[in-house]
């Protein structure tokens, strides 16, 4: 009986480019906006995929990382379930490899399904260049890339 029930997890290992070294500005229990038109409004981060940290340290994420989230406000069929999301904006300032600094005015993410495909068809607001390099599908749907 227990072997038949299978939870939804990422089915395949999603191939992304190596991540840039960025300041991790989102940690567990952080609320963020959903920047796509999937029907979710507010997301809460409850975990970070591929995070290797110290014992008892809260997992943290930077733009481009995959977060495990729950929908706090949005369509009823999305709420009270575990989803995956890609973080695209953070308020915390971080340094780029060319020496410039960048920050955004909100924390935002876009929902993905368990195959790594975007749930929404549009992305509202700017997307950093680092995320556009890692996720080509996000760069094609973004309104502006900073």
Curated annotation (Swiss-Prot):
CDD domains listed in its UniProt record: Ribosomal_uL14 (cd00337)
Record's GO cellular component terms: cytosolic large ribosomal subunit
Pfam families: Ribosomal_L14
Domain of life of the native organism: Eukaryota
Keyword Cytoplasm on entry: no
GO molecular function, one term: large ribosomal subunit rRNA binding
SMART domains: Ribosomal_L14
Alphabetical GO biological process terms: translation
Keyword Ribosomal protein: yes
PANTHER family named among the record's database cross-references: 50S/60S RIBOSOMAL PROTEIN L14/L23, LARGE RIBOSOMAL SUBUNIT PROTEIN UL14
NCBIfam families to which the protein is assigned, alphabetical: PRK08571.1 (NF006344)
Entry similarity comment: Belongs to the universal ribosomal protein uL14 family.
Protein name: Large ribosomal subunit protein uL14
